[in-house]
């Protein structure tokens, strides 16, 4: 996907310094019902130049069996700023250029996020 169903960006979905935010593109978020139905593990998207990973979400709330929504837009360009206010979905945020690496072995998925200096920013192991 390109646009963010979930995002803590400070001003792309409402200027969080002056008003409320939709915390992502609501038209895109409607698709999440399909991700819930088909038990999708990860949804990756860009558009915003930063990194953010959600908690697993199902029916628009935390669920250990839900989908991780990953904003991986830090490959280049001007970096975005995050809202000064916390939200219910964000597990990890990083304002810096980065890349993802995913290894799959048998029934395990290993998910790594590194900054441009190869420092580990985020890690997740998923067993299926």
Walk through the language-model features, giving the residues of each.
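A structural signal for well-ordered alpha-helical segments within the folded catalytic domains
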Residues: 29, 33, 48, 96-97, ...
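Binuclear metal-dependent phosphoesterase catalytic core
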Residues: 52, 56, 60-128
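Active-site-proximal segments of metal-dependent phosphoesterases and phosphodiesterases across multiple
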Residues: 1-42, 61-65, 80
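Divalent metal-coordination and catalytic microenvironments
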Residues: 2, 8, 47, 69, ...
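Catalytic metal-binding/acid-base residues of hydrolase active sites
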Residues: 4, 41, 48-51, 75-76
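Non-transmembrane, interaction-prone segments in cytosolic or luminal domains
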Residues: 5, 16, 24, 46, ...
């Amino acid at each position: 996907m390109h646009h963010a169903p979930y995002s803590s960006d400070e001003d792309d979905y409402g200027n969080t310094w002056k008003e409320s935010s939709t915390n992502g593109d609501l038209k895109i978020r409607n698709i999440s019902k399909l991700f819930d139905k088909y038990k999708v593990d990860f949804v990756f998207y860009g558009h915003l130049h930063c990194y953010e990973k959600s908690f697993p979400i199902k029916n628009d709330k935390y669920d250990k069996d839900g989908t991780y929504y990953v904003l991986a837009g830090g490959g280049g360009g001007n970096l975005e700023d995050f809202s000064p206010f916390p939200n219910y979905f964000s597990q990890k945020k990083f304002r810096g250029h980065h890349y993802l690496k995913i290894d799959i072995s048998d029934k395990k998925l290993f998910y790594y996020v590194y900054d441009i200096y190869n420092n580990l920013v985020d890690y997740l192991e998923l067993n299926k």
